Amino acid sequence: MAHNHPPYPCFTVEICRRGLLGEPFRLIDVGVRGGVGEHWLFFGDHLELWGFDPLEEAIEPLRSANKRPGRMHYFTMGLGDKDEARPFRFYPENPPSSHFAASNGCNNDAIDSHWQQVQLRRLDTLFADGTIGPVDFMKMDAETYEVEIIRGAERFLAESGIFGVESETAFFRTPRNPRSHFVELFEELAPLGFDVYDAGIHRAPRAAMARGFPKLEGESYKLRPVGRAWVFDFLFLRGFEQIDASTSIDRLLKIIAVAETYGLQDVGLEILLTHKNRLSKRLDVEQAADWLVRDRTDTKLTYREYLRL
């Protein structure tokens, strides 16, 4: 999905490289097939990951290539609202269409040899038994089962310290989500203080222009995605408006870094300047403001210069 991830999040890189961030950035990736998103790798050795996929063939390559098993953890299991085994259908020709059998039976799935039993666990269970500790952020790409994951995470969401969720979702209605997936997902997250901050869009073009619209750039044409907005990738954040003296400096730094990671440098900069007295105990606030107006390695633009543009 097309979030505006900066090519070089200078603030995030610098607080990690200089040792200004005093604790890990803790991430859950639900649907980690193919590896964690490259934008998270800017946290470097500060990144601690719990990655989940229901199939061993997705997890085994990640485990085999894992050079940081102490902080990068991969699990062959799905997440949901129950601790159980459930049939899972994998489509090798189109992995994003793979899915669990619906728990309420509304999909009328015909379970045959193409399905396999996989383990589901609630986040509350994994949090209670210590498999997962404190968490800052969770990314979910679970092919419409994100609502069930949230419903199985009541204690986790209340006690883990998580302040951000990225989730694939959609507005069309189905028998399993009659009011739409987004409505049901937001109804679970909103009472916990999460608000919408960003959205990426995946478009579904009609067959007549499936390759995209030919946009002239210079002397050649570039194909620009077109089509109805079909699937979305929403960013939900909480606590950004209720920061107080109880919010640790490390948490402030991670909140600013996540805002930058999603191209919300204005949000990060406002937090930095609002809480400059506390943050100045850890870093040079003016220099940090400079980092937040840079997204490339070849610019030396400062915040003061930005204000004069």
Q: What label would you give each PLM region?
A:
Residues 96-98, 103-109, 118-130:
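Switch- and interface-adjacent substructures of P-loop NTPase systems
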Residues 110-116, 225-229:
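A recurrent flexible, glycine/aromatic-enriched loop bordering the glycosyltransferase active site
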Residues 25-26, 40-51, 129-266, 275, ...:
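Conserved acidic-Pro-Pro-aromatic motif
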Residues 248-309:
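C-terminal accessory extensions appended to soluble enzyme cores
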Residues 15-19, 124-131, 155:
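Short amphipathic alpha-helix with an adjacent loop that forms part of the alpha/beta core around
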Residues 75-79, 117-120, 139:
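Conserved residues in the N-terminal Rossmann fold of short-chain dehydrogenase/reductase
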Residues 5-95, 101-113, 171-174:
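SAM cofactor-binding core of SAM-dependent methyltransferases
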Residues 1-3:
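S-adenosyl-L-methionine
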